[in-house]
Amino acid sequence: MILAFDYGTQKIGVASGNELLGTATPLKALPCKNTQPNWDDIAALLKEWEPEALVVGLPLNMDGSDSESTVRARKFANRLHGRFGKKVWLIDERLSTREARERTGIKKADSRVDSMAAVIIAEGFFAGDAKVF
């Protein structure tokens, strides 16, 4: 069991993933306050789901370079590891939001898109595209 996160400064999409089946399910999008995650909400998810590992999407630029969002996502991953002691994997999530919009048919900002992006991040992890943090 893993939890995958699509980190954003307004919302964090979350999905659960089953490694044996290679499937993921969207859970929810957690709201952020002043660009900061609500750590109590994240702690509650970890307690409920008891994941073996966490996967965070890394929003790289199209040329593979880091952006301001990449730096924030790495910081989020670092804090997840520091606070909860879980193994955290990073995965290139370029175009995951675009694919999530295509899958859901939702074009505007919507929490369902964020949690579907987390599903895509989990699927990438199952495909072997992740790097350990």
UniProtKB/Swiss-Prot annotation:
Gene3D superfamilies: YqgF/RNase H-like domain. This is Putative pre-16S rRNA nuclease. It is an enzyme of class 3 (hydrolase). CDD domains: YqgF. Could be a nuclease involved in processing of the 5'-end of pre-16S rRNA. It holds the Pfam family RuvX. GO terms for cellular component: cytosol. It is found in: Cytoplasm. Its main location: cytoplasm. Its EC number is 3.1.-.-. It comes from Alcanivorax borkumensis (strain ATCC 700651 / DSM 11573 / NCIMB 13689 / SK2). GO terms for biological process: rRNA 5'-end processing. Keywords: Cytoplasm, Hydrolase, Nuclease, Ribosome biogenesis. It comes from the Bacteria. Belongs to the YqgF nuclease family. Signal peptide: none annotated. The keyword Cytoplasm applies. The keyword Cytoplasm applies.
